[in-house]
């Protein structure tokens, strides 16, 4: 099943000029995913048109990489989310997660504690993309900002204390992780990444 999913899914990865992007590229290639990488300096409309063209041949997913700064500073990413929302599934990691929350009207604020290469035990719902994973789950955190005033449209799937660590919008097929599944500090990160892509593309396959 995983092999079939990989062969039928093409990932469009937006690189927010972050070193973790290369970890994601390696993970996706190991999974056998089709992959196209764009820097966030590329026109959002150009990326969206490429996704529409690819969707005629395979399932398509948008992956938003980690990166420095705030979502508003991340080039085409905020505008691209609005173009893709409800059309193609989206997975956002760290900065990408924050951009998803902001796109639905949530706030991004400075976190009380800056996390840089720290591991935290998050609690999760134990189903969907978190199925068959440890509870709590050790994850890697690299962030000084966090989501706040969570919009009603988003469901919090995992958290650490009061910090939302995973959110989703089921109808729009949007999923965000504040942590880094591609880091070696995250337990079962490869499994989580694959189950997340599986979850996001499941409905698309049935369309």
PLM region descriptions:
Residues 1-88, 95, 187-188, 194-207:
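N-terminal beta1-alpha1 cap of cysteine-dependent amidohydrolase-like domains
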Residues 39-40, 110, 141, 158:
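Short loop/edge segments at beta-strand edges and connector loops
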Residues 58-131, 138:
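Cysteine-nucleophile active-site neighborhood
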Residues 94, 143, 180:
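Histidine-centered divalent metal-coordination motifs
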Residues 128-171:
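Catalytic beta-strand/loop cores that center a nucleophilic Ser/Cys/Thr
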Residues 161-203:
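A glycine-centered loop/beta-turn motif at secondary-structure junctions
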């Amino acid at each position: 099943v995983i092999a079939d999913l990989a062969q039928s899914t093409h990932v469009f990865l937006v690189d927010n000029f972050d070193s973790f992007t290369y970890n994601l590229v390696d993970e996706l290639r190991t999974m056998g995913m089709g992959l196209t990488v764009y820097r966030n300096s590329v026109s959002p409309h150009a990326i969206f048109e490429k996704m529409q063209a690819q969707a005629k041949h395979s399932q398509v997913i948008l992956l938003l990489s980690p990166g420095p700064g705030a979502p508003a500073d991340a080039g085409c990413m905020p505008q691209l989310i609005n173009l893709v929302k409800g059309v193609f599934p989206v997975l956002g990691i760290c900065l990408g997660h924050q951009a998803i929350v902001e796109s639905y009207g949530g706030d991004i604020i400075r976190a009380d504690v800056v996390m840089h290469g720290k591991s935290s035990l998050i609690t999760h719902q134990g189903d969907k993309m978190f199925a068959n994973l440890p509870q709590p789950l050790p994850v890697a955190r690299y962030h000084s900002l966090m989501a706040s005033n969570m919009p009603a449209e988003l469901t919090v799937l995992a958290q650490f204390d009061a910090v939302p660590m995973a959110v989703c919008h089921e109808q729009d097929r949007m999923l965000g992780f504040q942590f880094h599944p591609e880091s070696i500090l995250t337990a079962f990160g490869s499994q989580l990444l694959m189950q997340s892509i599986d979850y996001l593309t499941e409905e698309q396959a049935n369309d």
